[in-house]
Each structure stands twice: as C-alpha cells, then as structure tokens.
C-alpha cells in the first residue's frame, strides 16, 4: 500500500504550491490540510498541536516532517485525548519510537469535560499562525476527507490568536498528563478498538487507494508490531541479549522479526518447516529490499549470505554446528520461530551454540503440555505479549465462532501408550470411519466459513 511519508515522496514543489487559508478537503491537493501544514512546518521555530485523537495513518504521514522540524532545533508539543479510545496506541508508540522524548506528548486528563479541539499552531520569529477546524490527525482528515479548516495569523487577528493560544497553554500545562512509557503501556493494555474506529479505518483505506499509485509501496510496521518494536528497543537499552515475543497467530511475528533485525548485518532465522522458511525469506526480502539470502536445509547448505534461513532438522545436527560451517559468533541476530519447541534437543543445540548480539524467540503458544520451561532459555525476558483475545479486541484479528459437534466415535477399545492413544490404531479408527467423514462434510457445508 502506498504511503505518503514526506514532502519529498509526494513530489510536490512547495515553493510554487498554491497557498490558501481555507482548506475544505476533497480531491484538490491544494485544498487539503496536509500540504498547507507541511509548508508551515518547514519554517516554524516551534509547533503546538491539539487534537481530540491521533490515528496511526495520520501520524505516519506527518512523521518525517516532524523529524525534520526537530532536527532544525524546533520544539514540538502535542496534546491529544484518550476518551473512548479513538487515539490508537500504535500512533503514540510510533511517535515515541521515531521521535522519542524530543516531542512533549500529553493526554488531556480532565474527566468532566468533553475534548474536541483540532488546531495546529506554528510559531515563527516575528509572528505565529493558527490552523483551526475539523481535522484530527488521520490520513483522510488531513487529505481528501471533507474537513473545513481555516488559517489566520497573529498579526492579522492578534486578539483571537491570543485567546486560542492562552487556552492551549492552560490545557497543556494544567489539564494534561505526560505520556511516558508507563502511561503508554497502561493505555495500550486497556485499549479496545472502538466501534467508530471501523469507519475511520475504512475512510483511511479508501484514501490510500486513491493516492498516487506511482509511489513505491513501503513495508512498514503496523499496530502491535510498532508496540513490540518499542518494547524490544527498550529491553536492549536495558542490556538484554535475549527476548521472547508472545503474539497470537496473525499479528505478524515474522514481519516483526524482519523489522527488528533490519539494523543487524548477519541474521539467522530458524524454523521447523520448509514452507515457513520460504515465507519468512519473502518477508525479510520485502522489508530489507534485498534478495541476498540463502537457505540451510535439505540438500542446500548456504553459508556465505548475510541472511540464512535454516531448518531445525538440518542446522540442529551436531556435524553442522562448528567452525567449518558457522562460527558461534557469525550471526549478529538470531530468530527462533515456534520458540515453544526450543526445549527440544535440536533447538537447544542451536540456541546454545550461537552467540549473537541478540536472540529473539517467537511463539503464539508458550505453554507446553509436558511442563518444560521455555522462559529460562530467553532469560525470562518477555518484553511484549498480545493474546488472541487482545488481538481481536484491538481490531488486529477477526473474531470467529467455535462449533462443537458431537462425534460418536468409540475410543474405548484403543490402547494407550505413554499417556496417548496408539497412533496406528487411532489412524485406522479415523480413516475407516465413513460416518465421521460424512459428519464432517455435513457440518462443513452447513457452516462453511461464515
């Protein structure tokens, strides 16, 4: 999906761009708030933003310009709301991850009053200008959505400017709380995707479909991936060399590993199935924009590429874990997929042999039926986790239904070996059970994928 990430990427000549004080949105880019904000941001000595909510899509659009503004030495303050949970945690994490503490980011905290302002204030050497209207920070609100915004200068209307800015200062200083790591984590853990967010996301998606299709798509972290990346950066800053990420299937753990390992030169990705390795290779290729990788599995034993995707069955053999193939410190970053298997012999040999700068374990199911402890392998360090339930509540995964169907198959005559049904007997029971086959097909036809 195409992304507007900076003024350069949208290929607009701002020096000759038509400037207007009245922005009404729609398809004409000259009437969209985003392009006017960029012009103001390029010159401002400080920026104050007050909006009722932040969406990841809007933050992503403004991120590069905010970063350039900070590099020029300008100060940025942002006050937003947390009422009804419309502000997305990923939007806040994105600001924290890319801009850090250089931005003074706060929540409006007075519970007794509604909070719906939308204003962008830019301060220059001899004057200020203020945009006020209907646009929060989301893609559609900043671009083609029908939003009415007006800009005026402190020189042309000093009295009204003073009133607006005085109110902003009062709200920011006296009616806000700083969004530090603790507050952000608390907000994220309690956040459920509100119903209205579905409409906002739909508007943003529709807007992305109408963007300039000549812009090269960028692979960038989304949602929970942004939160997990922040957690991983924090844990490394504290000195951790190993970590386990627990995330439900569908969150995007492989892409997360690709994003997190991007700064490391030599990376090893370990999984137990060839299909997973090939899919992971494509993900890493897209994130790194490089096909310089190889596989270590079956008959293929690549050892000279910066990215190696290895099967446990091959790499886990003692004859391959030596200097002839890989030095123990060859890889800077090691990813162990399906980390709940890491207590098994082949996985353990791999984990114990290599000495990377950082080891990342990925799993959706950390609990094991045999009671073996996988947490000790990653030094009991789990910086981020998101369950299936949380993923659904946050709108990152689709909800589903379980259907319990009674099965009359008789298991009483099967032998139990080491606490389990004898595998051959169980297979015969299933394979030769025509009634069970018909039952499965009947209810498959009834429910399908609804």
Task: State the predicted function of each range.
Residues 1-222, 226:
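PLD/PLD-like phosphodiesterase catalytic module centered on the HKD motif
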Residues 52, 267-273, 450:
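Conserved RecA-like ASCE P-loop NTPase motor core of nucleic-acid helicases/translocases
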Residues 225-237:
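Pre-Walker A adenine-sensing motif
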Residues 237-260:
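Walker A/P-loop
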Residues 267, 275-300:
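Conserved helix-turn-beta segment of the N-terminal RecA-like "Helicase ATP-binding" lobe
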Residues 298-330, 344-349:
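Conserved helix/coil segment N-terminal to the catalytic DExD/H
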Residues 340-402:
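Post-DEXD/H (motif II) to motif III coupling segment of the RecA-like Helicase ATP-binding lobe
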Residues 382-449:
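Conserved interdomain linker/interface between the two RecA-like ATPase lobes of SF2 helicase motors
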